[in-house]
């Protein structure tokens, strides 16, 4: 059975040096058809699958399901893009040193996604 000091020691071991502290962002975006405001599905033309493939063309590395047939996530620069149950696209940012870096990362991601949206006819 755990003792109080076991728990305290566990948390003390997790304390990082001030110079090793990092921050990261996570945010989800609903992707909607511009003309109908309907949520995109994975398989439809210019849908979530095609969006992910566009990201692959921009240097993101795909991660596949167990059957190695369906892209379920992307990775680049310590960042990842994943899908939520409602087909929302989530950016999990890299571990960065300051808020300015997270701002740059978020703006880069949103620009890439909005550029694809211009081509495919969706909005966030």
Summary of predicted features, one role per range:
Residues 1-124:
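Terminal catalytic/cofactor-binding subdomain
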């Amino acid at each position: 059975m755990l003792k109080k000091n076991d728990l305290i020691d566990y948390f003390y071991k997790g304390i990082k040096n001030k110079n090793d502290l990092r921050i990261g962002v996570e945010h989800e975006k609903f992707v909607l058809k511009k003309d109908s405001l309907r949520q995109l599905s994975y398989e439809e033309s210019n849908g979530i699958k095609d969006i992910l493939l566009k990201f692959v063309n921009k240097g993101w590395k795909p991660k596949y399901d167990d059957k190695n047939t369906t892209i379920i996530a992307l990775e680049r620069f310590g960042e990842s893009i994943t899908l939520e149950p409602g087909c929302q696209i989530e950016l999990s940012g890299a571990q960065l040193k300051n808020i300015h870096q997270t701002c740059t990362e978020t703006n880069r991601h949103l620009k890439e996604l909005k550029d694809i949206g211009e081509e495919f006819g969706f909005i966030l």
